[in-house]
C-alpha cells in the first residue's frame, strides 16, 4: 500500500516531486509508525465491517482501529467480538481470492495499484489493499483470546490498541501481546493510549509519565506509536472543546500534551511516535467565530468551493489543529469520520521547500555544523540544531511524498477528496 495510492498514477505524477513509497505490514516499525497517518476508528459492531474496511481503503485510508472499548455499549462486547472474528475471516477469504498476502500486501498487490485505473478496485474486488488493522481491546485477556479465535485470519491483523495505559495496567497488556505473538507466530504491534486521569493530574503526572516510559521502553520493538486520549482528559474536568477551538486552546490539555512529548517524544533515539488527538466534529448549522481558513490558498479554479465545503463541515478547525499537532511534536491523527482522513494526509505531505532544506542540512560535508541560507532564500538553516528536524522531515517524505514546487495542500486535498 502507499499514501495517495487511491488516485491514478498520472495524478500522482502531477502532484509529487517524489512520490510516497510503497510499504507493507511487514515493513520496518520505524517506517510504519510514520506511515500510520489518519487512523480511522470504527465500532466493532458494524455488521458489514469487512466491506467498510475495503471501502475506506479505496478512499485512501491505510490504518484502522476496530474498537471494542468506548465506542460500544458494555452489553455489546460479546457480540462485537464474534462479529470481529467473522469479519476478519471474510477479509482473509477475499484477500486469498485476490492473490495477496493479508496485511502484508505482497509486492504483486502493489504492482496492481500502480496500474492505471486500478489504484483500487471496487470494495471487495481484487486490487484493494487491506489497511493496517488494529483492535482496541478493554482487557489484556481479550488479546490472547481474540488471537486464538482468529485462527489463520490473524494474518490480517497488525496489532492492538491498549486503552488507559499506565505502567501497572500496561504491563499486563504487553505481556498478553507477547504471549499472543508467540502463539500465532506473527509480529503484533501495540499502540498504548495515554488517557488516564492520573496522567492529567499535576501531582501524579511526573511519576505516571516515568512509569509509562519504563514500560514502553522495555517493549520498544513492539510499541508502534503512542496515542493521546484527549476526550478522556477533557472528561476529567467536565470540559469539551468547541469546533472553533483546537486541543491547544484548552490549556490543561495542552500542558499534558507538552509533557508527554517532553518525556516520550524526544528526538535523541529514546522517543516514540506520538499521534495527534481525535477531532470530534463533522458539520453544524451555526458558528460563533470567524472561519480560520484564509482565502488566498483557495483562489484558483474550484478551490473556493472546496474552502466553503471545509468550513461548512467544521474542517477549518481540524486543519489548524493538524498544523499545531506537528508544531508540537505529534504525527498522524486519530480520526472518527472518513471526511477527516484527506486533510490529515494532505497536510502530512512534505513541501518542496521543507524537503530542500532538510536535504541541504543533511548533505555530506555538513557534519561539522555551520549556517547556510535556505535555497528558498527566506530563512537560516543551522546544520546542528536543525539536524533532528531534517531527519524527521525526510522520514515523513519517504512515506507521504514530496510535493512539486508549485503544488500546495489545497491541490493535495482536492486530489484526495475527488478520487
Sequence positions of predicted segments:
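Expand to "…catalyze enediolate/carbanion chemistry for C-C bond making/breaking, isomerization
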Residues: 1-419
Amino acid at each position: 500500500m502507499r499514501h495517495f495510492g487511491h488516485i491514478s498514477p498520472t495524478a500522482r505524477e502531477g502532484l509529487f516531486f517524489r512520490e510516497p513509497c510503497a510499504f507493507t505490514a511487514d515493513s520496518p516499525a520505524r517506517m510504519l509508525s510514520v506511515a500510520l497517518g489518519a487512523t480511522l476508528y470504527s465500532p466493532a459492531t458494524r455488521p458489514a465491517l469487512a466491506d467498510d474496511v475495503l471501502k475506506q481503503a479505496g478512499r485512501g485510508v491505510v490504518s484502522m482501529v476496530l474498537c471494542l472499548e468506548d465506542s460500544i455499549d458494555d452489553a455489546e462486547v460479546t457480540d462485537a467480538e464474534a462479529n470481529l472474528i467473522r469479519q476478519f475471516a471474510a477479509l482473509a477469504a477475499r484477500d486469498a481470492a485476490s492473490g495477496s498476502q493479508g496485511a502484508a500486501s505482497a509486492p504483486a498487490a502493489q504492482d496492481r495499484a500502480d496500474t492505471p485505473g486500478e489504484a483500487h478496485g471496487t470494495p471487495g474486488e481484487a486490487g484493494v489493499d487491506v489497511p493496517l488493522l488494529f483492535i482496541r481491546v478493554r482487557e489484556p485477556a481479550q488479546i490472547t483470546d481474540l488471537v486464538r479465535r482468529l485462527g489463520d485470519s490473524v494474518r490480517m491483523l497488525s496489532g492492538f490498541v491498549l486503552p488507559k495505559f499506565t505502567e501497572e495496567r500496561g504491563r499486563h497488556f504487553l505481556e498478553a501481546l507477547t504471549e499472543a505473538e508467540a502463539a500465532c507466530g506473527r509480529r503484533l504491534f501495540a499502540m498504548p493510549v495515554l488517557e488516564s486521569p492520573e496522567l492529567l493530574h499535576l501531582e501524579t503526572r511526573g511519576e505516571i509519565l516515568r512509569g509509562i516510559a519504563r514500560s514502553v521502553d522495555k517493549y520498544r520493538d513492539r510499541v508502534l506509536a503512542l496515542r493521546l486520549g484527549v476526550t478522556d482528559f477533557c472528561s476529567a474536568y467536565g470540559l469539551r472543546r468547541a469546533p472553533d477551538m483546537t486541543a491547544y486552546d484548552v490549556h490543561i490539555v495542552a500542558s499534558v500534551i507538552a509533557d508527554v512529548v517532553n518525556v516520550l517524544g524526544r528526538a535523541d533515539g529514546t522517543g516514540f511516535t506520538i499521534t495527534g488527538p481525535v477531532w470530534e466534529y463533522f458539520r453544524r448549522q451555526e458558528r460563533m467565530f470567524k472561519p480560520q481558513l484564509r482565502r488566498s490558498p483557495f483562489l484558483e479554479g474550484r478551490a473556493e468551493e472546496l474552502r466553503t465545503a471545509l468550513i461548512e463541515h467544521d474542517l477549518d478547525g481540524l486543519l489548524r489543529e493538524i498544523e499545531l499537532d506537528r508544531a508540537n511534536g505529534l504525527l498522524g491523527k486519530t480520526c472518527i469520520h472518513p471526511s477527516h482522513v484527506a486533510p490529515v494526509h494532505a497536510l502530512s505531505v512534505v513541501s518542496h521547500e521543507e524537503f530542500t532544506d532538510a536535504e541541504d542540512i543533511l548533505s555530506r560535508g555538513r557534519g561539522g555544523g555551520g549556517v547556510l541560507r535556505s535555497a528558498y532564500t527566506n530563512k537560516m538553516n543551522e546544520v546542528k540544531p536543525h539536524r533532528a528536524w531534517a531527519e524527521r522531515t525526510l522520514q515523513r517524505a519517504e512515506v507521504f511524498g514530496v510535493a512539486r514546487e508549485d503544488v500546495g495542500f489545497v491541490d493535495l486535498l482536492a486530489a484526495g477528496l475527488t478520487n
